[in-house]
Curated annotation (Swiss-Prot):
Main subcellular location: membrane
Induction: Not induced by nitrate or by growth on low nitrate concentration. Strongly up-regulated upon inoculation with the plant growth-promoting rhizobacteria Phyllobacterium.
Keywords: Membrane, Nitrate assimilation, Phosphoprotein, Transmembrane, Transmembrane helix
Compartment list: Membrane
Identification of the protein by name: High affinity nitrate transporter 2.6
Bilayer-spanning residue ranges: 79-99, 115-135, 139-159, 169-189, 193-213, 236-256, 292-312, 320-340, 362-382, 387-407, 421-441, 451-471
Phenotype caused by lack of the gene: Loss of plant growth and root system architecture responses to the rhizospheric Phyllobacterium.
Molecular-function GO term, any one: nitrate transmembrane transporter activity
């Protein structure tokens, strides 16, 4: 049925296609007003999308309460999958006081298992980056969920320290879903809001580390009420996260979509998307020095957070003589802060970019990461329970916001190797966690309190390299963009990832579109300077 459009129906950008603008919505938008005279045409290729999109068909509006396909559905499938994997990976942490008595674990055994739980994901996240670039985020997410589910079920059958460590190592592989989650949102949403979207997806997924601190003791208690002994109840409790992973894997395969225009394999067969070579994707990821700085930065933001998920419950339980339930609630509040802290970091990055460009994003990243690390030092030195809780909450907000701000920068490092760079950055988080747990929490050399303070000092020092991240087209914290007319263009930076032969085949066109949509990273002042001055100096009078 045809509809008559009028001015009162709303203009493009204020409503969905074919829907009036009268509905109340909750959204974050960067779309500029478009004159109402520009009517929607039936041959508009973007008309099939529920949200306004850019030239790459990436959404320019973020509506967290919507499940519209493909953009918002990919967002929700991505973060819930990651959330589920976080629950599984850290499900053992709040039950350690019971598990250690059942398996006769020493402090060293517990520390090594904590390292193992995050070490496996170093390799799986690297692999996931390549999988996303070559096969798409949908397959990567689903395979990670379903292939690691048997390991979660296996936790019910461990009999000694060795099997406990091995199973936690294998479960940790599922944390690779973080990479597919961030990749998925990066290809679905435009750069102007990518900090907020990635912050919400990553933060809400990380929240699983807090939820599991409440969920697993609760499930354990419920199973005990049925008549099971404590040493049996904790084993049955692991069936819950295992089942959740299988369910999410099926949902991702059946409901998900790789890219705004369809699944990657379908688009490659039709010739709409070129099939890339792994060697090329790998080379442009590892040779970019910015990748390795992000690797280190994430190692001491997300890495610190992963370490805290493994030690914080036991720290409050032992240091302040709390019950298992009370220690779990306090520990959960650390992870639950992700609900707003990480999105705040991403949003702050987006706002800084609108005002100051990429340089603003880098400053926000350094400030948040340094502040979070300082509060980590304070947490280790806190001598009373209220002060320790306050320090922990401030520390969690700073560190988690830094994670959000970092993934406001990461999508701009490379267009061709986006997945692999996301994988390397994510692997940095697990590497940093493994290092900090090995150095400070896996032996009797330091108390847990001393380990927390030393970890904070290390995080402060490792936040300094952000000053060396320089984009020729946008500059860095202290240096301006390149004065070279050619190098100062976004098209030159992203086009350099393609050979002349590849360009002649048109394989670089996606990167050029991305470059055009990334000009907002110049900042408001630079954008205004690029607007040509009208030939007539006086405005028309109306």
């Amino acid at each position: 049925m045809a509809h008559n459009h009028s001015n009162e129906d709303g203009s493009i950008g204020t409503s969905l296609h074919g829907v009036t603008a009268r509905e109340q919505v909750f959204s974050f938008s960067v779309q500029e007003d478009v004159p109402s005279s520009q009517a929607v045409r039936t041959n508009d290729p973007t008309a099939k999308f529920a949200l306004p999109v850019d030239s790459e068909h990436r959404a320019k509006v973020f509506k967290p309460l919507s499940f519209a396909k493909p953009h918002m559905r990919a967002f929700h499938l991505g973060w819930i999958s990651f959330f589920t994997c976080f629950i599984s990976t850290f499900a053992a942490a709040p039950l350690v006081p019971v598990i250690r008595d059942n398996l006769d674990l020493t402090k060293t055994d517990i520390g090594n298992a904590g390292v193992a739980s995050v070490s496996g994901a170093i390799f799986s996240r690297l692999a996931m980056g390549a999988v996303c670039d070559l096969l798409g985020a949908r397959y990567g997410t689903a395979f990670s969920l379903m292939l690691t589910a048997p390991a979660v079920f296996s936790m019910s059958f461990v009999a000694d320290a060795g099997s406990y460590l091995a199973v936690r190592f294998m479960i940790g592989f599922c944390l690779a879903t973080f990479v597919s989650c961030q990749y998925w949102t990066s290809v679905m949403f435009t750069g102007k809001i990518i900090g907020l979207v990635n912050g919400c997806a990553g933060g809400w997924g990380d929240m699983g580390g807090g939820v599991t601190q409440l969920l697993m003791p609760m499930v354990f208690h419920v199973i005990k009420l049925t008549g099971a002994t404590p040493f049996t109840a904790w084993r049955f409790a692991f069936f819950i996260p295992g089942i959740l992973q299988i369910v999410m894997g099926i949902l991702v395969l059946t409901l998900g979509q790789d890219l705004p225009d369809g699944n990657l394999s379908t688009l490659q067969k039709s010739g709409q998307v070129s099939k890339d070579k792994f060697s090329k994707v790998f080379w442009f990821a590892v040779k970019n020095y910015r990748t390795w700085i992000l690797f280190m930065l994430y190692g001491f933001s997300m890495g610190v957070e992963l370490t805290i998920n493994n030690v914080i419950s036991g720290y409050f339980y032992d240091r302040f003589n709390l019950t298992l339930h009370t220690a779990g609630i306090i520990a959960a509040s650390f992870g639950m802060a992700n609900f707003f802290a990480r999105p705040f970091g991403g949003y702050a990055s987006d706002v800084a970019a609108r005002l100051f460009g990429m340089r603003g994003r880098l400053w926000i990243l350094w400030i948040l990461q340094t502040v979070g690390a300082l509060f980590c030092i304070w947490l280790g030195r806190a001598s009373s329970l209220p002060i320790a809780i306050l320090a922990m909450m401030l520390f969690s907000m700073g560190t988690q916001a830094a994670c959000g701000a970092l993934f406001g920068v990461a999508p701009f490092v490379s267009r061709r190797s986006l997945g692999l760079i996301s994988g390397l950055t994510g692997a940095g988080g697990n590497f940093g966690s493994g290092v900090t747990q090995l150095l400070f929490f896996s032996s009797s050399r330091f108390s847990t309190a001393e380990g927390l303070s030393l970890m904070g000092v290390m995080a402060v020092v490792c936040s300094l390299p952000v000053a060396f991240i320089h984009f020729p087209q946008w500059g860095s914290m202290f240096l301006r963009p390149s004065q070279d007319g050619e190098k100062s263009k976004e098209e030159h930076y992203y086009g350099a990832e393609w050979t002349e032969e590849e360009k002649s085949l048109g394989l670089h066109e996606g990167s050029i579109k991305f470059a055009e949509n990334s000009r907002s990273e110049r900042g408001r002042k630079a954008m205004l300077a690029d607007i040509p001055t009208p030939e007539t100096g006086s405005p028309a009078h109306v």
